[in-house]
Amino acid sequence: MKMKAYAKINIALDAIGKREDNYHLLRMIMQTVDLYDVIDIEKSNDSNISISCNKHYVPTDERNLGYKAAVLFRDEFNIKNGVKISIKKNIPVAAGMAGGSTNAAAVLVIMNKLFNVNASLEVLKEIGLKIGADVPYCIEGGTALCEGIGEIITPLKPFENKILVVLKPNFGVSTKEVYTNLDINKIRKHVNIEGLIQAMENDDLDYVSKNMKNVLENVTLKKHTILKNIKEDMRKSGALGAMMSGSGPTVFAFFDDMLTAQRAFEFLKGKYKYSDVYITRTINSNNL
């Protein structure tokens, strides 16, 4: 049984506090984009969970979030069968685009159908939260306000069909390290989430592009100054606005039209030769 597992971007990411367990309390606007991995799962004749992937650098053991999802799902519903999981990876790894989380989400959704468990989305999201804070959102997808550590999800009016260019530099970033180095007291300006939500409801891409904000840029851009150059190059190439997604290092930019986006794509691909560059669009969860 196959399923597309879509990437996400953060149109806004704000940190407003910390829990006792040191997890940051966040307010984020998340958005699904049309860049996806393909997850294919079949039952096996034994009790083993095996993973194969087309990219050699993706772990295929218990470090893989898809593997963790399969283990938790089996435990939760007392399933004895093993599964063979195949991952066709297109989403860049350690990129701030929820590549691992969206794979875990797809594994839970597929296994729910494959074994006729018929668990509700809410139950799947509860299992997903044990794997990672982005997994519940990845199960739901679309345009959403995510609060808490990311698990409190409020669907928003779809902000679909917006053109963007995405650039993932040829290095990864540790999400844990970024959050460890984030000092909430040094955040001088918090994100105007409500203003952004209003603009998105009005389909005002220009306002969204110029006012989107990610407080994690304070940490990641300090360590990787090339990201500032990438953002600047995107703007000079005609972007309405550019920002880092999640903990980085991926940077994305919205464009008014496909021709300008195409030119920016070609320029960025030429300048940042060892980076992954994509043209994609925002999509609604109903497209999943």
Curated annotation (Swiss-Prot):
<keyword id="KW-0808">Transferase</keyword>
<dbReference type="InterPro" id="IPR014721">
    <property type="entry name" value="Ribsml_uS5_D2-typ_fold_subgr"/>
</dbReference>
<comment type="function">
    <text>Catalyzes the phosphorylation of the position 2 hydroxy group of 4-diphosphocytidyl-2C-methyl-D-erythritol.</text>
</comment>
<dbReference type="GO" id="GO:0019288">
    <property type="term" value="P:isopentenyl diphosphate biosynthetic process, methylerythritol 4-phosphate pathway"/>
</dbReference>
<comment type="similarity">
    <text>Belongs to the GHMP kinase family. IspE subfamily.</text>
</comment>
<dbReference type="InterPro" id="IPR013750">
    <property type="entry name" value="GHMP_kinase_C_dom"/>
</dbReference>
<dbReference type="InterPro" id="IPR006204">
    <property type="entry name" value="GHMP_kinase_N_dom"/>
</dbReference>
<dbReference type="Pfam" id="PF08544">
    <property type="entry name" value="GHMP_kinases_C"/>
</dbReference>
<feature type="active site">
    <location>
        <position position="8"/>
    </location>
</feature>
<dbReference type="GO" id="GO:0050515">
    <property type="term" value="F:4-(cytidine 5'-diphospho)-2-C-methyl-D-erythritol kinase activity"/>
</dbReference>
<dbReference type="InterPro" id="IPR036554">
    <property type="entry name" value="GHMP_kinase_C_sf"/>
</dbReference>
<dbReference type="GO" id="GO:0016114">
    <property type="term" value="P:terpenoid biosynthetic process"/>
</dbReference>
<feature type="active site">
    <location>
        <position position="134"/>
    </location>
</feature>
<protein>
    <recommendedName>
        <fullName>4-diphosphocytidyl-2-C-methyl-D-erythritol kinase</fullName>
        <ecNumber>2.7.1.148</ecNumber>
    </recommendedName>
</protein>
<keyword id="KW-0547">Nucleotide-binding</keyword>
<dbReference type="InterPro" id="IPR004424">
    <property type="entry name" value="IspE"/>
</dbReference>
<dbReference type="GO" id="GO:0005524">
    <property type="term" value="F:ATP binding"/>
</dbReference>
<dbReference type="InterPro" id="IPR020568">
    <property type="entry name" value="Ribosomal_Su5_D2-typ_SF"/>
</dbReference>
<keyword id="KW-0067">ATP-binding</keyword>
<feature type="binding site">
    <location>
        <begin position="92"/>
        <end position="102"/>
    </location>
    <ligand>
        <name>ATP</name>
    </ligand>
</feature>
<keyword id="KW-0414">Isoprene biosynthesis</keyword>
<dbReference type="Pfam" id="PF00288">
    <property type="entry name" value="GHMP_kinases_N"/>
</dbReference>
<keyword id="KW-0418">Kinase</keyword>
<comment type="pathway">
    <text>Isoprenoid biosynthesis; isopentenyl diphosphate biosynthesis via DXP pathway; isopentenyl diphosphate from 1-deoxy-D-xylulose 5-phosphate: step 3/6.</text>
</comment>
